[in-house]
């Protein structure tokens, strides 16, 4: 019997199942249906330019969408957000990838730097603003998630 070389952990319904592979899982020439779903994109590319790059009333650019989740890229560069936003349909999780922006919310004000993540609950008014640490490239990823979320990531 051949030696197990590769292990795969599959999570189904909160349970983990371990599968043994004798060939690398990356060798999979048989997957053709929905092959376009597996995609690498560079959010710094100029082709992903949202209207909020240089417009105060501009909005982020939608990259992915489903009924329950949306993924946007934001590149606010020149102007503070000219309006307050209140998403009553979804929580918003904001990841700062590059640069820095200040977020005013009904719950308080924070300044985000690369590596920071901000959770804005459904229904909370907010807006982003330039700050002293902002650069010519302030890049954020924004997830809009309609499902209820519970924070489970407390570091040990």
For every predicted segment, state its role.
Residues 106-122:
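Short acidic-glycine-tyrosine-enriched beta hairpin
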Residues 1-73, 83-84, 156:
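A short, N-terminal "cap"/entry segment at the start of jelly-roll beta-barrel domains
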Residues 61-65, 81-88, 105, 129-131:
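Short histidine-centered beta-strand/loop micro-motifs
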Residues 76, 86-103, 144-146:
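Short, conserved beta-strand element in jelly-roll/cupin
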Residues 84, 103-104, 120, 126-134, ...:
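Short beta-strand His + acidic residue motifs that chelate non-heme Fe in jelly-roll/DSBH
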Residues 119, 134-153:
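A short hydrophobic beta-strand segment most commonly corresponding to one strand
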């Amino acid at each position: 019997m051949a030696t197990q070389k590769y292990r795969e952990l599959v999570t189904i319904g909160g349970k983990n199942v371990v599968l043994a592979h004798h060939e690398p899982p990356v060798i999979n020439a048989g997957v053709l249906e929905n092959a376009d779903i597996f995609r690498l994109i560079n959010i710094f590319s100029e082709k992903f330019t949202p209207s909020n790059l240089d417009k105060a009333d501009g909005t982020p650019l939608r990259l992915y969408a489903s009924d329950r989740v949306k993924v946007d890229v934001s590149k606010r560069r020149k102007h503070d957000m000219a309006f307050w936003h209140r998403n009553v349909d979804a929580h918003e999780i904001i990841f700062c990838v590059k640069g820095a922006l200040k977020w005013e919310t009904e719950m308080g004000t924070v300044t985000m730097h690369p590596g920071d993540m901000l959770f804005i609950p459904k229904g909370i008014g907010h807006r982003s603003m330039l700050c002293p640490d902002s650069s010519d490239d302030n890049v954020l990823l924004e997830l809009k998630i309609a499902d209820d979320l519970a924070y489970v990531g407390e570091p040990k």
